[in-house]
Amino acid sequence: MEPPGRRRGRAQPPLLLPLSLLALLALLGGGGGGGAAALPAGCKHDGRPRGAGRAAGAAEGKVVCSSLELAQVLPPDTLPNRTVTLILSNNKISELKNGSFSGLSLLERLDLRNNLISSIDPGAFWGLSSLKRLDLTNNRIGCLNADIFRGLTNLVRLNLSGNLFSSLSQGTFDYLASLRSLEFQTEYLLCDCNILWMHRWVKEKNITVRDTRCVYPKSLQAQPVTGVKQELLTCDPPLELPSFYMTPSHRQVVFEGDSLPFQCMASYIDQDMQVLWYQDGRIVETDESQGIFVEKNMIHNCSLIASALTISNIQAGSTGNWGCHVQTKRGNNTRTVDIVVLESSAQYCPPERVVNNKGDFRWPRTLAGITAYLQCTRNTHGSGIYPGNPQDERKAWRRCDRGGFWADDDYSRCQYANDVTRVLYMFNQMPLNLTNAVATARQLLAYTVEAANFSDKMDVIFVAEMIEKFGRFTKEEKSKELGDVMVDIASNIMLADERVLWLAQREAKACSRIVQCLQRIATYRLAGGAHVYSTYSPNIALEAYVIKSTGFTGMTCTVFQKVAASDRTGLSDYGRRDPEGNLDKQLSFKCNVSNTFSSLALKNTIVEASIQLPPSLFSPKQKRELRPTDDSLYKLQLIAFRNGKLFPATGNSTNLADDGKRRTVVTPVILTKIDGVNVDTHHIPVNVTLRRIAHGADAVAARWDFDLLNGQGGWKSDGCHILYSDENITTIQCYSLSNYAVLMDLTGSELYTQAASLLHPVVYTTAIILLLCLLAVIVSYIYHHSLIRISLKSWHMLVNLCFHIFLTCVVFVGGITQTRNASICQAVGIILHYSTLATVLWVGVTARNIYKQVTKKAKRCQDPDEPPPPPRPMLRFYLIGGGIPIIVCGITAAANIKNYGSRPNAPYCWMAWEPSLGAFYGPASFITFVNCMYFLSIFIQLKRHPERKYELKEPTEEQQRLAANENGEINHQDSMSLSLISTSALENEHTFHSQLLGASLTLLLYVALWMFGALAVSLYYPLDLVFSFVFGATSLSFSAFFVVHHCVNREDVRLAWIMTCCPGRSSYSVQVNVQPPNSNGTNGEAPKCPNSSAESSCTNKSASSFKNSSQGCKLTNLQAAAAQCHANSLPLNSTPQLDNSLTEHSMDNDIKMHVAPLEVQFRTNVHSSRHHKNRSKGHRASRLTVLREYAYDVPTSVEGSVQNGLPKSRLGNNEGHSRSRRAYLAYRERQYNPPQQDSSDACSTLPKSSRNFEKPVSTTSKKDALRKPAVVELENQQKSYGLNLAIQNGPIKSNGQEGPLLGTDSTGNVRTGLWKHETTV
């Protein structure tokens, strides 16, 4: 038997070979084996062995036809019969017909995801007995029943997620006997009573429901379907439809005759559902005459019910609200839309801008009959406390009526635009209880400290509502302090603007509600058994007593404030607390069982009001009218208000005491009340004395009645009259217990705020003197700018310094107490902040300038071809002195404008304490410290270098170039020209010591003035009086110092004043440039001295060169005298040596000579007595330097001068000062011009400042040229004038051409003029 078996085993390989070839051909050709047709284009056929141990005929096939946009399932004959997996996902298959997959009996997995399947016929999956996995995810399946899944007996996993059905009916999966996993998550899944069967079926069949959660109702959203408790799966109202919409869904604006179709669709959840149409609550049915057509209800895909409405001919009556109404036994639901029908000639509402407390709204041009909507402005804070869904857009609406006019509007859904109002609204929405009432009240109290800045009526209304809520808890023992906090809040509200309080009273009776809440505080507190209750605040004082009617002998109560009568802040700030936070500024009560006022005299107080209750208040007649509680014990309340702000008259009060708001409350308001009594006691007078805070006319005594003007309240004068009145006090008498006050007509009068708006007279007087002195300095330095010898930088610094001190003083005396106007007060704070910082910065700039001049070193010669450095602009000083304060103030104001102005605890205009530390006190202290360091450095430098006394001028650019070009010719010029320095070389008349003294004392006096002024306005009596006088003394000292230092002690300023006030005394200034008359025929020719030193100073000059060139010689007065008289000439080698001991006394006593008038004529030959070429120029320069300085004090006369006959009539301090200055300049010349052996060293040893006097005057030195005549007049009014026959600034060169320096007359004489003791030849 074995061999046949072996033979059979050997016969198998020939049979397997054809089968393998057929399978290979099927794979390569893409066709199905076993006679199957080819796959459609784009499909992929994948066949591979299932396993090594499986028979050859049991092959597995996978067909993938994904993303081919197939519109229907492929015919079964196009697929291999042995297909195991069929992928038809991501196509456009819309329906599955009966027998769509017949013949695929081996199919185990069918994937139909992401198609458009909406209809599945029963038996669609018939023949798929081997199918184990079916995926119908993300289709449009709405109808599911058991017949659909008939024949799927081996189906293990079914996925129906992402379809349209909202519920599954019982028995849907009865034919799926092998089902183990199920998914049916949809966007419309409704977990109600219709899926209760699912819980039982899942447990019985042991089915796993994956990733399926409830979507509706909202209460079960996101809960697993099988995890919901069965008792929650109900079909009770309200009805929540998974899908319900109406198109169009928004308001429709149409014209008459138009056609408008509507559609309404809802989730089909019950068989009795129906859709109805309504217009303005009336049911709508088909009416062909009016063009209305209603389609019957239609069921779509077993999931939606729909209905349609068509209005084919719209008329004006179609305007209204149209709705789609879904009706079921489980409840109803409605969707509506507005229809506006317009005529052909419709009108429009114009565009309009509305600004209110909810924001800025710009309404567009809108058709008549249309309601316009605008989105509210979103704010980050408080957005969660407004009504509506936070996800919804909150909008304001406004209706435009048919006439084209804006009508109703609504902004209630919008947040308040103002931060203050928004926060107060948040307070108002907070839930209150006994635990958090006190804490919330304290938070509100802290916020109402800024009540003076309230700008919206809703601010006051919200606070009034909060006070009413707090009042409910005042009766509780745990909330004892709540009453005190309520009084403080009401006191802060009195700081608000009267207009805001008036609007709040008119809108919601807010002020009256606050007062009535305060009246109930004492009632609740005394109900607990207490006999006395009192609470005080800056603007309100409350006192309550339990009084026995028996033995009552009357009572006098006084309202006072613990400040001195001379305290000027006692009347204006209306009870603001003082900076230390104590309550000395608050109102207080003091009562005494007496009916006389004299026994209640209080020291150091301001009595605001007093009230006298007579002994007959509890007479036997009244005792019967009263309703006693606890054996004839009565609760007496007294409330005092600093002013009448909480009692505004809002209605038509023409017939009342205020006479249509013509009269105003000008006194405090005092309230008297006995609990349980509200009757007029016509026969019992109550005397009230009130202090007036304003002056007016037509005074009327009045009492407040809360019931007048429909509950708005008003003042009436019935039963009240005035007993006595003087300038400040008014006594009235009323015959009822009420709120008492005095009203006056303030037309043309202002609030009596003398103590608030006026400082002490000493402050004003001394400040005016300081302002006048500063103004005099500013005007003098601006008007006489060209005559005052001061550098341009120093001039700018001094003028700006004076201006900012002037600005500080003006703003201080004029605005420091203007606390009633918030805007003005803020402006005062900003200006004071700026001017103070600017002043100390300009002092610092001045100190830095002095330091640079003191430490300045001599400049060396530079290459003539090298361009000079660019000039540094004056703007840099303004950027420091004015720019830095502007930046600091700008940042402070931009951060919070409320940093400036009056604080609630300060009766002056300045800054808040915290911002001022970093924005003012810190920078000001640092700048002051830097200034002091500069002053100390200058002082040390001057001690080390006592020779540095004056500030010298800088050579101009042209002078520097000329000096560099003339270096080779210096040996040919008189050495006197190298060392010639006069007062014209001074840049500033003041010495460095004087400038240092001026800057340091200015800073010291300014800081002292600022501090004393601040103390004078911030402290109370008597310290404010003391510092007012100290301020005055400092101000006078400051004034005297400024005028003396910057004006009186300066010769140039004094000269300018003399020229302005006494023009006749300055006649010489007119003669300065006048040429003298010809003297040839009068005086003849002056004698000549050929061997004089005047001749010897002109070296190496021929006759022709002397005639035709402008090289010229410089002759001092002494040289000119020597030229006239050879016997009196100085020896050549006997030049006196000048050392550091050169003083005014030595110069005046060493040489005393008088040189007669001199006239020099040109001569043709000048050869005799010429100096030797090898003569030392250093000795000559030294000699001429000393002679030049001597020449300053040698009195001479010039022929033809009007002053040559005036004697020296005055020798005083001014002349001594001038001589000392010239002596110093001579010393400085000698220091800068040491003896030189040859001309080759001139450039390296001579500073540029010394060469400044050898170059011609350039265009940049016009200011110095303008100053010279004035200086000549000042120095020569008391003596004759020297004569110099050479040009002071050296030869003039222009384009290589030389010309005569001065013209001559017909006789050849030189025309001489007076110019700084010199005559130009």
Curated annotation (Swiss-Prot):
InterPro entries: Adhesion_GPCR_A (IPR051963), Cys-rich_flank_reg_C (IPR000483), GAIN_B (IPR057244), GAIN_dom_sf (IPR046338), GPCR_2-like_7TM (IPR017981), GPCR_2_extracell_dom_sf (IPR036445), GPCR_2_extracellular_dom (IPR001879), GPCR_2_secretin-like (IPR000832). LRR repeats lie at residues 82-103, 106-127, 130-151, 154-175, 594-620. Residues 187-237 form the LRRCT domain. GO terms for cellular component: external side of plasma membrane; membrane; plasma membrane. Glycans are attached at N81, N98, N159, N206, N301, N332, N433, N453, N592, N652, N687, N728, N821. Residues 1-33 form the signal peptide. It comes from the Eukaryota. Residues 701-750 are annotated as: GPS. Interacts (via PDZ-binding motif) with DLG1. This is Adhesion G protein-coupled receptor A3. It comes from Homo sapiens.
